[in-house]
UniProtKB/Swiss-Prot annotation:
This is Gamma-glutamyl phosphate reductase. It is found in: Cytoplasm. Its EC number is 1.2.1.41. The gene is proA. GO terms for biological process: L-proline biosynthetic process. Keywords: Amino-acid biosynthesis, Cytoplasm, NADP, Oxidoreductase, Proline biosynthesis. The lineage of its organism: Bacteria, Bacillati, Bacillota, Bacilli, Lactobacillales. It comes from Streptococcus sanguinis (strain SK36). InterPro entries: Ald_DH/histidinol_DH, Ald_DH_C, Ald_DH_N, Aldehyde_DH_dom, G-glutamylP_reductase_CS, Glu-5-SA_DH, GPR_dom. Belongs to the gamma-glutamyl phosphate reductase family. Pathway: Amino-acid biosynthesis; L-proline biosynthesis; L-glutamate 5-semialdehyde from L-glutamate: step 2/2. One of its GO terms (molecular function) is NADP binding. Catalyzes the NADPH-dependent reduction of L-glutamate 5-phosphate into L-glutamate 5-semialdehyde and phosphate. The product spontaneously undergoes cyclization to form 1-pyrroline-5-carboxylate. It catalyses: L-glutamate 5-semialdehyde + phosphate + NADP(+) = L-glutamyl 5-phosphate + NADPH + H(+). Pfam families: Aldedh (PF00171).
Length: 420
């Protein structure tokens, strides 16, 4: 087992091969990585089967779905890498250029971050996405997977490094920490001087631990207590379609809806239709039903479990939905501001004034009008694969693509000027 410190030192020695790589060299590397990922699919699937076997009975079915890989998902991972080839290289872009009265020309230039650390849980695609994004944005990467997905992550990293071996960029620019204990996570949090940025991707406990304990700069990828508010002026057919997609298409992801707010004026007609869609129709289709956790007002119209106060502060990542009735748009916004993690929140309404009020007042990274929250995703936003969804305001907010993984410096060109 290679120590975490040894990994930090190794990546420092080779980071210049990626920090200074040309766009053509990086794109060639991405193509080779994508190619080798697909060619190694048999090994990756075998490793994933080991992880799945070990994890069964220890994590929920929804979390098992996050961990599971098949050829289709590996193909999507490879395609995600290739999509970055077509995106503009942010490194070297001149953001601003100013000529002063004294003749100095000051340029603000985008540069690589250096070395990026990622601590994540049971998401195999994060391994390939993070490595590819770091590479295209000019940085080396140190990956620390959760133990549930370690064998899969190792097989993926092995394939990516085999791809890099065919290029001018050192394979050691991608490092996977073999120690999945808390000690390695702590080492990454304290790796000042080795990591230029640390990004946690996972549950609330992991993210909170990193934010509270790290001495290196951190971008917080928040949990998703995601709300959909159905206004009294909503198109109810549209609302039901949005809710079905936001809750059932993939409940285990951070942009899935967890809380439904409904204006009480439409509850009598709307809630029975909601229950039919999420429960009755799914029973008939032999699909997993949604457990509805209802506040007292909602329970007057449909049946379900009684909602506890903490249900409105929980990222279920499962087939569970908390439902609350509100008396006004203002009450809906107040509830969201009190309980949201500022990830993604949506309003369904045909009232332009209500939509404008919602988008101005809700302080989340992504605010939707008449659309599913499942679109909060780098690929859907045209950014390619993403490093995560930032819920903070400094440096990056929302889906983090290539530009969000860079920094900048000032280049000052003179002709001999001295300060008087």
């Amino acid at each position: 087992m290679t120590s975490t410190q040894a990994i930090f030192e190794k990546v420092q020695k080779v980071k210049k091969t990626i920090n200074t790589a040309t766009t053509a060299e990086k794109n060639h590397a991405l193509e080779e990585m994508a190619k080798q990922l697909w060619l190694s699919r048999t090994d990756i699937l075998a490793a994933n089967e080991l992880d799945m076997t070990t994890a069964k009975g220890k994590i929920s079915d929804v979390m098992l779905d996050r961990l599971y890989l098949d050829e289709e998902r590996i193909a999507a991972m490879a395609e995600g890498i290739r999509q970055l080839i077509d995106l503009e290289d942010p490194v070297g872009q001149v953001l601003e250029r100013t000529e002063l009265d004294n003749g100095l020309v000051i340029s603000k230039k985008r540069v690589a971050m250096g070395v990026i650390g990622i601590i994540y849980e049971s998401r195999p695609n994060v391994t390939s996405d993070a490595a590819a994004l770091a590479l295209k944005s000019g940085s080396a990467v140190v990956l620390r997977s959760g133990k549930d997905a370690y064998q899969t992550a190792l097989a993926i990293v092995t394939a990516l490094k085999e791809g890099l071996a065919q290029t001018k960029i050192s394979p050691d620019c991608i490092q996977l920490v073999s120690d999945t204990s808390r000690a390695s996570a702590q080492a990454m949090m304290k790796a000042k001087g080795y990591l230029d940025l640390l990004i946690p991707r996972g549950g609330a406990g992991l993210i909170q631990a990193v934010v509270e304990n790290a001495t290196v700069p951190v971008i917080e990828t928040g949990t998703g207590i995601v709300h959909v508010y159905v206004d009294k002026d909503a198109d109810q057919d549209k609302a039901l379609a949005i809710i079905e997609n936001a809750k059932t298409s993939r409940p285990s992801v951070c942009n899935a809806m967890e809380v439904l707010l409904v204006h009480e004026e439409i509850a009598e007609r709307f809630l029975p239709r909601l229950q039919k869609m999420l429960v009755t129709d799914r029973v008939a289709a032999q699909e997993k039903t949604i457990e509805l956790r209802l506040d007292e007002k909602a329970a007057q119209y449909i049946s379900g479990s009684q909602a506890r106060p903490e249900d409105f502060d929980t990222e279920f990542l499962d087939y569970v939905l908390a439902v609350k009735l509100v008396s006004s748009l203002e009450e809906a916004v107040e509830h969201i501001e009190a309980h949201s993690t500022h990830h993604s929140d949506a309003i369904v309404t045909e009232n332009d004034s209500a939509a404008a009020y919602f988008t101005e007042q809700v302080d989340s990274a992504a605010v939707y009008v008449n659309a599913s929250t499942r679109f909060t995703d780098g690929g859907q936003f045209g950014l390619g694969c993403e490093m995560g969804i930032s819920t903070q305001k400094l440096h990056a907010r929302g889906p983090m693509g290539l530009k969000e993984l860079t920094s900048y410096k000032y280049v000052i060109q003179g002709t001999g000027q001295v300060r008087k």
